[in-house]
Each structure stands twice: as C-alpha cells, then as structure tokens.
C-alpha cells in the first residue's frame, strides 16, 4: 500500500491535492513551496532525500515549461529536473502533466513507472 506521497512544485492545484491526500490519511511531503505562500495546515519539507523516498511523487501540470526545471513558482530556487530524477525512489510511481519526451525517456531508462495526467481522456481538453 502506498503511504508516503510527495507533492513537488506546481501551483495552488498542487496544494489542494496535498490537502486532500493528507485528509485521507496519507503522509504528505510538500516540496517547492517555500516562497510567498500560506500553507495553512501543511508544512514544506526541506529534506530533498526524504521527499524523493516517497512511494508516490506528484509533479505539476505542466511538469516543466523549459525542459530543464520543474514548474515551481513558489520555490525559492529553481528545481532542476535532473537533480530530482537521479534520486527518485526506483519503486515510486510518478505522476505529472504534459511530461516531455526527454523526461519520459529518462524515467523509462531508470525503470521508474509514471503516468501523465493529460494522457487520460477525461482530463485532456
């Protein structure tokens, strides 16, 4: 059973997901929300290793705008995709939206399972 979920980067939709998961009893690690935002009942985790050890990693929609950094408007520092990719728990399931082909290939090369939200018919427009 998946128990630990990391929500990394993104906008207010990601915070809503984190709150809903926490309310369902999941242990939620929130990362990349350390600038100019009120977290209310959530806490932002600063230990990247702990965040990347989660069973599930939830990335934003879109995962990236530039192909190099995670979409993270509330992070103090840019979050470089390659810095995260090499440290993700290999048995984790990664979710994200509009995952670019180079990131998909890197996940596949590292044998990391992933799902793109926008590949689901009910979520794409």
Q: Positions of the model-derived regions?
A:
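NAD(P)-binding Rossmann-fold cofactor-contacting core
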Residues: 24-40
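Glycine/serine-rich phosphate-binding loop and adjoining beta1-alpha1 elements at the start
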Residues: 58-124
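Hydrophobic anchor at the start of a short beta-strand
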Residues: 5, 28-31, 114
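Glycine-rich adenosine-cofactor-binding loop
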Residues: 5-16, 21, 125
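Residues in the short beta-alpha loop(s) of Rossmann-like NAD(P)-binding domains
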Residues: 11, 34, 98-100
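Phosphate-coordination loops involved in phosphoryl transfer and adenosine-cofactor binding
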Residues: 2-4, 91
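Short acidic low-complexity segments
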Residues: 40-53
């Amino acid at each position: 059973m998946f128990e630990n979920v990391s929500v990394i980067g993104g906008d207010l939709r990601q915070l809503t997901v984190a709150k809903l998961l926490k309310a369902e009893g999941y242990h939620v690690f929130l990362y990349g929300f350390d600038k100019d935002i009120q977290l209310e009942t959530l806490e932002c985790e600063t230990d990247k290793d702990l965040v990347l050890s989660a069973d599930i990693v939830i990335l934003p929609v879109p995962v990236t705008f530039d192909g190099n950094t995670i979409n993270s408007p509330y992070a103090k520092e840019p979050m470089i995709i390659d810095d995260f990719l090499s440290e993700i728990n290999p048995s984790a399931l990664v979710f994200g939206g509009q995952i670019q082909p180079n990131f998909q290939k890197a996940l596949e090369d590292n044998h990391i399972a992933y799902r793109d939200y926008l590949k689901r018919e009910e979520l794409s427009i």
